[in-house]
From Swiss-Prot:
Entry keywords, A to Z: Signal
Native source species: Escherichia coli (strain K12)
Similarity comment: family membership: To E.coli YjfY.
Signal peptide: 1-19
Any one of the GO BP annotations: response to stress
Pfam family, one: YdgH_BhsA-like
Alphabetized InterPro entries for the sequence: BhsA/McbA_stress_biofilm_assoc, Dodecin-like, YdgH, YdgH-like_sf, YdgH/BhsA/McbA-like_dom
Protein name as catalogued: Protein YdgH
């Protein structure tokens, strides 16, 4: 069974948690800038994402790679093993070819990684029957151009009714759009034990700690547009609020890889959806005094039971 989330490869591992291997792990930005020379698959039983990353690093060493980037992980069969896919890079890796953004009706189409870095000045919304995505883009860009936009990013596209009509909303930007103040979604929580230790250490370690109140690149701007049209959630980490008011937050894989768990849990049950699974994890995490958790594995047992394992953090 696939893991809950596609792996967003971790930033450089904390020296507190892992030993250093010869092959280093690249950040998503670094990996996107160069060409890999090979892609490998590593399988094994790993109790945490950090163990999987170290196994990939050892494989990269054997292949003569200077660095690597974990592309994906998944459960391998029903054995509880992981299947980890990674790209390998030479020290003198060629630079990746830069791709230019499409221009439609004179308006530049932005990918998400570029759109989240700048502030839109307005939104446009169109609704109708569109037979293809090019027709959608044509309608959106005409509306954007009418408002004097230089570029656009489609933030919401849904079926409006049972008749095949769609409703599409896009952020629109000026050429000299103001840059947003943002941080990575993979930073260490500032009020966690790992966060306090990193801040005390200072230097590069402190740079991996979140800045409270600063938006992340995982979410677009909330400065313009109507919330239901532009925001899929309130932003920030997924948080479970228990009946007694206790809040427990879920960490993504990249953040968890930079922290050291103080405990772990494993349980099985029949759960209808991931919201229920998250609640069950958070409930058990809170009983052990955890403020954060990271689901490491999920796999289907016989029948409809799901087994879940998670690391816990203070």
């Amino acid at each position: 069974m696939k893991l809950k989330n596609t792996l967003l490869a971790s930033a450089l591992l904390s020296a507190m948690a892992f030993s250093v291997n010869a092959a280093t792990e690249l950040t998503p930005e670094q990996a996107a800038a160069v060409k890999p020379f090979d892609r490998v698959v590593v399988t094994g039983r790993f109790n945490a994402i950090g163990e999987a990353v170290k196994a990939v690093s050892r494989r990269a060493d054997k292949e003569g790679a200077a660095s690597f980037y974990v592309v994906d992980t998944s459960d391998f069969g029903n054995s509880g093993n992981w299947r980890v896919v990674a790209d390998l890079y030479k020290a003198d890796a060629e630079k990746a070819e830069e791709t230019s953004n499409r221009v439609i009706n004179g308006v530049v189409e932005l990918p998400k990684d570029q759109a989240v870095l700048i502030e839109p000045f307005d939104t446009v919304t169109v609704q109708g029957f569109y037979r293809s995505q090019p027709e959608v883009n044509d309608a959106i860009t005409k509306a954007a151009k009418a408002k004097g936009a230089y570029s656009f990013y489609i933030v919401r596209q849904i079926d409006a009714n049972q008749g095949g009509n769609q409703r599409i909303t896009a952020f629109i930007y000026k050429k000299d759009a103001k840059k947003r103040i943002v941080q990575s979604p993979d930073v260490i929580p500032a009020d966690s034990e790992a966060g306090r230790a990193a801040l005390a250490a200072g230097g590069e370690a402190a740079k991996k700690v979140e800045i409270p109140g600063v938006a992340t690149t995982a979410s677009p701007s909330s400065e313009v547009g109507r919330f239901f049209e532009t925001q899929s959630s309130k932003g920030g980490r997924y948080t479970v609020t228990l009946p007694d008011g206790t809040k427990v937050e879920e960490l993504n894989k990249a953040t968890a890889a930079m922290m050291v768990p103080f405990d772990s849990i494993k349980f099985s049950g029949n759960y209808g959806n991931m919201t229920e699974v998250s609640y069950q994890v958070a409930k058990r995490a809170a009983k052990k005094g955890a403020k954060y958790y990271h689901i490491t594995r999920q796999w289907q047992e016989r029948g409809n039971n799901l087994t879940v394992s998670a690391d816990l953090y203070k």
